[in-house]
Amino acid sequence: MKQFSAKHALAVVVTAGHALAASTQGISEDLYTRLVEMATISQAAYADLCNIPSTIIKGEKIYNSQTDINGWILRDDSSKEIITVFRGTGSDTNLQLDTNYTLTPFDTLPQCNGCEVHGGYYIGWVSVQDQVESLVKQQVSQYPDYALTVTGHSLGASLAALTAAQLSATYDNIRLYTFGEPRSGNQAFASYMNDAFQASSPDTTQYFRVTHANDGIPNLPPVEQGYAHGGVEYWSVDPYSAQNTFVCTGDEVQCCEAQGGQGVNNAHTTYFGMTSGACTW
């Protein structure tokens, strides 16, 4: 498989010309540590939350047997946050959701005007919506000064995006971290997310869309089918580090999506050296 080094990545960004001004190399160590922490939780969700950070308290399980959607409500008292995490694809049932590209009205969030979202992931979201909203409400009532964080990888990333969108209608101070997120909806949905999560700039964004090397999943579903990405993209290239993380705004095809990756590849299953469910970190 073709490897993407930081040197190669910089050459790609510079060659892009119009994209140069919207792409910068390097993020702070604090932000990098935060992205790695959220990636750890998201990758651990494939294996019943193995090896999560010691400050994380494992709470209630989110599960629907018909869609095989899995998630958890977690709490971190050290950072004063309530974390919702979703597992990515783990079964044939999940795969059926992945491949349902039909754009569907986001009816559970009517204030998202004109929004259509990935049909399969919307089915998954609706199947656990009541659980998620009830469990989050319980946690917020017990810890009213805690922030809300939502995260996930792959299918779990898109579920995290839909969940964060829904919760944003009720709660303030929500942060969203996704890893290897497919395109989750149409341009109206992407615009809604950018507005709701202040994603017009890396200085204000609360929507951190993390990609890796030539991960092929962020290229799906195709833009030709009406899909678009939201959020600020943080593109990690190897060897992974704060310095080798690019901040990409504007044209969504300038960083990860420009590398030509297709579908599930090694770059998709591994983020910051952690492979989905491997628990070797």
Curated annotation (Swiss-Prot):
GO terms for cellular component: extracellular region. GO terms for biological process: cell wall macromolecule catabolic process; lipid metabolic process; pectin catabolic process; xylan catabolic process. Its main location: secreted. Disulfide bonds join C50-C279, C112-C115, C248-C255. Pfam families: Lipase_3 (PF01764). Residues 1-21 form the signal peptide. Optimum pH is 5.0. It is found in: Secreted. Substrate binds at D98, Y101, H268. Changing D92I: Active against longer alpha-naphthyl esters than wild-type (C10, C12 and C16). Km value for the C8 alpha-naphthyl ester is decreased by 1.6-fold compared to wild-type. Decreased activity on arabinoxylan. InterPro entries: AB_hydrolase_fold (IPR029058), AB_hydrolase_lip/est (IPR051299), Fungal_lipase-type (IPR002921). The active site is at S154 (nucleophile), D215 (charge relay system), H268 (charge relay system). Its EC number is 3.1.1.73. Keywords: Carbohydrate metabolism, Disulfide bond, Glycoprotein, Hydrolase, Polysaccharide degradation, Secreted, Serine esterase, Signal, Xylan degradation. Glycans are attached at N100. GO terms for molecular function: feruloyl esterase activity. Gene3D superfamilies: alpha/beta hydrolase (3.40.50.1820). It catalyses: feruloyl-polysaccharide + H2O = ferulate + polysaccharide. Involved in the degradation of plant cell walls. Hydrolyzes the feruloyl-arabinose ester bond in arabinoxylans, and the feruloyl-galactose ester bond in pectin. Active against methyl ferulate, methyl sinapate, methyl caffeate, and alpha-naphthyl esters with chains containing 2 to 8 carbons (C2-C8). Inactive against alpha-naphthyl esters with longer chains (C10 or more). Belongs to the AB hydrolase superfamily. FaeA family. This is Feruloyl esterase A.
